[in-house]
Amino acid sequence: MKPVFLFLLSFFISYASYAQPYVSYITGNAGDMITSPKGGICLMGGATEDDHAMRWFLQQANGGDILVLRTTGSNGYNNYLYSDLGIDVHSVETIVCTSPAAAYHPYVLQRVAEAEAIWFAGGDQWSYISNWRNTPVDSIINTMIAQRHITIGGTSAGMAIQGGFYFSAQNGTVTSSTALANPYHSLVTLDSSHFIAQDVLRNIITDTHFDNPDRKGRLMSFLAKIYEDYGVFAKAIACEEYTAVCIDSAGTGRVFGGWPATDDNAYFVSSNCELSQPAPENCTPGQALTWLRGGMAVKACRIRGTANGANTFSIPNWQGTGNLSWFHWSANNGVFIEQAGTAPQCIPTAQHFPSAKSPVHVYPNPFDKQVFVYTDKMDASTVSIRIVSLQGQIMPIPALDVFENGWMLNTQSLAPGIYFLSLFTNGEMYTNQILQKVSE
């Protein structure tokens, strides 16, 4: 039986005096169908949806319920997903979150928990981030990914939010020329704060509409800035507008598109692991990017997108098969350079350190008898802490010790399972941590 998220009233705004913060459109059966989804991720470039990729997405739901999440628009996906593609599903529901309060509404949370597949529509990724990050919505989505292996997909902004690193577009979009001229321009807003947790995309940033306009230069700038700010040699997956990458549970991405009739491609990009000194030569505020390394700073694999998705790329092994070409990318004083390249003779790896932007940290996780919670941006004396079960029950957890910026909690009384960690301070609630209790 699926969990129903009956969060206590203290978690929510009282809706009695407010308009409903969402609009729901249901096609098919309104009740819940319990199936076993197959997992996976569908990343789509942002123009018209690729029908073959969307059929893959629906098949991963295994006949279950499809949920479309968006903050603007209407029900344009409903008939398309329910009947036009010829894949049987139980229902398609679009929920338009018209207010940030929707992220706390019991109906929205229940429907998120019941979905076998969730599709993020295009739109404004900052709207998604600012409305859903650190709320029960993203906590439940991530729990369902981890527990039930639901399938996640999205186009344009809905693709842009799915990497462990992401371009938030908080101040608007940015062109390649602007990002190359100054990787620290106010429009280059990159983030790694916990949002959509896909393990295979943990050290990856995605980019969309990659050929309209050409975004190779800005992606180079993104990767350089991530290294400078986070100490991580991140990787990237980019889709041209009519291309999709559908990633199965083993981490293999099939590339869908219209090749050879149309020039549809996806790119898999990483720093050059063959170099002893791979870091950018100059990535500093107010200056043009230089990441040259003999013209071999970055390796990019271009894969043609076809109707049957026959050309593939293994993300764990960072190797492709089928119709593909390798390129070397570099940047010299803000000028992007592309030349023919070779496949890497090594597997790129990423050093990853906890983000300094995350306000809450937990160790260990999964946990057993004790768990240490600390905050590097909040005074523990001003914070109240809760651990809440999947059923919405607040668990009585005595603090063993209180430190200046954290607690050691006694968790022996908790049964094994998934819990939400919430902290309250200065009128704000943080729900960006999911805890797992293992058997003692």
Enumerate the language-model features and the residues they cover:
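Catalytic-core regions built around general acid/base machinery
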Residues: 111, 134-148
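Bacterial N-terminal signal peptides
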Residues: 6-14
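Glycine/threonine-rich flexible loop motifs
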Residues: 125-135
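Catalytic nucleophile loop
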Residues: 121-122, 145-166
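C-terminal and late-domain segments of enzyme folds
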Residues: 20-63, 174-348
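C-terminal outer-membrane/trafficking sorting elements
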Residues: 354-363, 367-440
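Sec/Tat signal peptide C-region and signal peptidase I cleavage site
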Residues: 15-19
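N-terminal beta1-alpha1 cap of cysteine-dependent amidohydrolase-like domains
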Residues: 21-121
